[in-house]
Amino acid sequence: MPLALVFSAIAVFEFGARYGATNMQAYAIASELKFPLNVFAQNEANMDNSSKEYFAMMIDKGIAAGAMHRQIWYLDRDAQAALDSLLGYALKVRGDAVTERYALMEASEDIPALNQTKLAKIREALAEAKVDLIDKAPKVAEQE
């Protein structure tokens, strides 16, 4: 019986640690995405092509990470709200270019099948995030 209590305590501790780490990761993804997104949104017209592509790649990577992370079922409401807020803005700034980037990567024959499967999951997560955060988002008139 005491051994069962030890194992249950370990399981509870591990779940709590995983839950907390997952929430902190959501905040980290949002904060890592914030700076390049603000720079890109404010200076896109003044950037040269190489800078624009570099910032777009960084932002797309952050959007993909956030879209995948928001699918975790035990994500805290506040952490998900912070992530969703920034992801919604990022998806508006980048538009369909994010999905196109990952579709082109998936269509490439140079990528192994395992990575193509991961890319397909990323594209599905991006599509779901776009529907939830852009298409189904309440309009300004509906919020008032």
Regions found by a protein language model. Give the residues of each.
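Low-complexity intrinsically disordered segments
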Residues: 73-144
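Extracytoplasmic/periplasmic/luminal assembly and interaction segments
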Residues: 29, 33, 37-89
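N-terminal signal-anchor/signal peptide hydrophobic helix marking the start
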Residues: 1-3
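Transmembrane signal-anchor/signal-peptide helices with a preference for the extracytoplasmic
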Residues: 5-31
